[in-house]
Design a protein with these regions (language model features):
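Bacterial Sec-dependent N-terminal signal peptides
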Residues: 1-32, 276-278
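Extended soluble regions of mature proteins
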Residues: 28, 33-278
């Protein structure tokens, strides 16, 4: 594990990997350690508006929360399924055939981050790729200062109660149910007296809502991939993401209209101006 300050990311790496399929970080190619096991998963739908200049455009995707005995893990469901397929192909000696089938186009995702909760104990670990490096940072699980409110409602078949917190530059409204005694939820959110069924920021730029709870007949591993992570802080990580975006835009402007790939990068990054945290 390396520790270093985060520098501005060269544009070259982004131009080489401009595709929105962030699954280019192939986690199944790396050694990993098993942290826990789960036989219960919770799928959430996320709807988000990534462009503040076009709030009518709403994107959506499925995310998965794997609930272990001690550790839980949250990530893109497409990313999870694609990584598992790749690892199975690698174990069977069929990795090249797997690449040749180009399965990745069926498992597109905007989210390559992964979040481990209660790893290390009492903290969560957020890890992601900001080209060209892999970064991780940790924060205390108790980072959320929830305000429990009296308002109640129902979502689907679940009676829910309202809660509020401030995090990542946004005001968040959560609806949780004590009928599912799991103090967890989507993204980094946890710590309420029951499962979070729905949570959104007050502008509804990011909305997570429960899709399905599944229990399996067998247990699956919760893994942490050893990718030579650069350990940093949340603040420095967010700064790296912002610097990455600004670097793309400034260099694309300097490149002129003849640099097609840079102009494509410029247009793409202009539309991704509304991160979940800032």
């Amino acid at each position: 594990m390396r520790t270093q300050s985060i520098l501005r990311i060269p544009l070259l790496f982004f131009v080489m990997q401009i595709s929105a399929i962030q699954l280019s970080a192939q986690f199944y190619d790396y050694p990993y350690q098993v942290l826990d096991s789960f036989n219960l998963s919770i799928t959430y739908s996320i709807a988000w508006k990534e462009d503040t200049n076009n709030l009518e455009r709403v994107r959506s995707e499925k995310m998965i929360l794997m609930v272990g005995k001690e550790v839980s893990k949250f990530m893109s469901k497409n990313f999870y399924e694609y990584s598992n397929m790749g690892r199975e192909a690698e174990r069977a000696g069929l990795l090249q055939e797997f690449f040749d089938r180009n399965e990745r186009q069926n498992y597109r995702t905007r989210f390559s981050y992964q979040i481990l909760k209660n790893y290390p104990k009492g903290s969560y670990t957020y890890y992601n790729k900001v080209l060209p490096d892999f970064f991780q940072y940790a924060e205390p699980l108790q980072v959320f200062q929830w305000e429990l409110l009296d308002e109640t409602d129902s979502i689907g078949n679940y009676p829910v109660q309202k809660a509020h917190c401030t995090y990542g530059g946004r005001e968040w409204v959560a609806w949780y149910t004590s009928s599912v005694p799991i103090n967890d939820g989507p993204y980094k959110f946890r710590g309420l007296p029951g499962l979070i069924i729905k949570i959104h920021d007050e502008k509804e730029h990011y909305v997570f809502i429960l899709d399905v709870i599944e229990r399996y007949d067998k247990y699956f591993d919760i893994e942490f991939e050893d990718m030579g992570w650069v350990t940093t802080t949340r603040e420095n990580y967010l700064m790296a993401e912002q610097n990455f975006r600004l670097d793309i835009i400034s260099r694309a402007k300097e490149a002129g209209a003849t640099a097609v790939s840079m102009q494509r990068a410029y247009r793409s990054m202009l539309k991704k101006n509304n991160p979940i945290e800032f």
